Amino acid sequence: MLDGVNLIIYGAAVSAISFFGVLFLTPAAIRSLTAKRKVVPDAHKAEKPPVPRPAGPVIMISIAAAEIVLFVLTMNIAILAILLTTAIAFIVGYIDDSRVMPGWFKPVALLAAAVPLVVLDVLHMGEVYGESLNLIFGRAYIPLLYMPLIFVIIPVAGNTINSIDVLNGVASGFLIIAVIPLLASIAI
């Protein structure tokens, strides 16, 4: 477990890695995607300017770099589980965005993203998500519920984010609003 000072230092470090990764990789990605004519009209602007896509690889590379650094610093198996879950969810989303897939594909494929969380927790005896849920009103100890709940939460969360991302930036703004109370409850 990290103490408060290291938590802040590591949090600032991984945030900086993610931020600067996106900041520096995005211009190169824009040039590359534009040169390859991988652009689509921006449906949310009146003049419909061409926008390069996909931006997901830049975001994933930046998140993965930050998570790898955090794992190396802490050697916390939960970070590795989060990295693998994020990578699998990214691959599923990338496939879903680049090809026309049937409606059932994404929710079913996102079940694979839950596997690292469950398998690494079983292999490392409670180091990934622990023995109890830390809730605002106290702790709940229901270990048999955690595994099936993870297999429900990952596909539901993935599809929810996909469905609320109707305008540029809506998903990121919504996630910031949703994460603030979550972080507060974890800190308490």
Where are these regions (language model features)?
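"…together with the soluble PPM/PP2C metallo-phosphatase catalytic core" -> "…together
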Residues: 2-188
